[in-house]
Design a protein with these regions (language model features):
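Class I S-adenosyl-L-methionine-dependent methyltransferase catalytic core
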Residues: 1-169
C-alpha cells in the first residue's frame, strides 16, 4: 500500500468511530437487483461488515465476496477483487466515495438519492451512473428487518459502463 492510501486510512480512523450506529445491512433481495449488472464481476469486495450476512448472500448468488470483520478504514484493502459493492454508512458517504475512487476499481454503493443534491458529489457527476430501485428499500439491523426506510436510495455506480446513465428498475 502506498503512503497516500496509508494517509487516507489514518485520516478516516476518527471518522469511522462516528458510524458506530450506522450499520444497516443489505438484504439478499437488494443484492439480487444488481445481478444483471455485474455478470462479468465475480470477486466482490464489501469493506463494511455488519453481521456478515452479505458475504453469505453473495455466495448463495454465486459470487465470491471479501467481507471480513475489520474496520474499512483501519486496514489495507485486498487487491484481488473485481468490484466494490457496499451499503456504506450514510454518515460518511463522502469519505467512502473518495476512498473508492482512490482504489481505482469499479464500484456500486448504495446511498440516499438526496446525496445527489450535495455540493461535494458534483465533481463526480460525469463519472457516475445510477441504478434506481422501483421502491424504497428495507434494511436489517442486528439481524432483524427494519420497519422500512423513510427515504429513497439508489445505487451509485462507477466503471460498469451501463447502457444508460440512469436505470430505473
Amino acid at each position: 500500500m502506498d503512503n497516500n492510501k496509508n494517509h487516507m486510512i489514518l485520516n478516516f480512523k476518527t471518522t469511522a468511530k462516528k458510524f458506530k450506529d450506522d450499520d444497516y445491512e443489505t438484504t439478499k433481495e437488494i443484492l439480487e437487483m444488481l445481478l444483471p449488472y455485474i455478470k462479468n464481476f465475480n470477486k466482490i469486495y464489501d469493506p463494511f461488515y455488519c453481521n456478515g450476512a452479505v458475504k453469505k448472500y453473495w455466495e448463495e448468488l454465486g459470487k465470491k465476496c471479501y467481507n471480513e470483520k475489520l474496520d474499512a478504514f483501519d486496514r489495507e484493502h485486498p487487491e484481488d477483487f473485481d468490484i466494490i459493492i457496499s451499503n456504506i454508512p450514510f454518515t460518511i458517504k463522502q469519505k467512502c466515495m473518495e476512498l473508492f475512487f482512490e482504489l481505482k476499481k469499479p464500484f456500486i454503493i448504495l446511498m440516499p438519492i438526496a446525496a445527489m443534491g450535495a455540493k461535494w458529489i458534483s465533481k463526480y457527476f460525469e463519472k457516475l451512473q445510477l441504478i434506481i430501485p422501483h421502491k424504497r428499500l428495507n434494511f436489517s439491523k442486528n439481524g432483524k428487518m427494519g420497519a422500512g426506510s423513510w427515504f429513497d436510495t439508489c445505487f451509485y455506480c462507477y466503471g460498469l459502463n451501463l447502457k444508460k446513465d440512469i436505470i430505473k428498475l
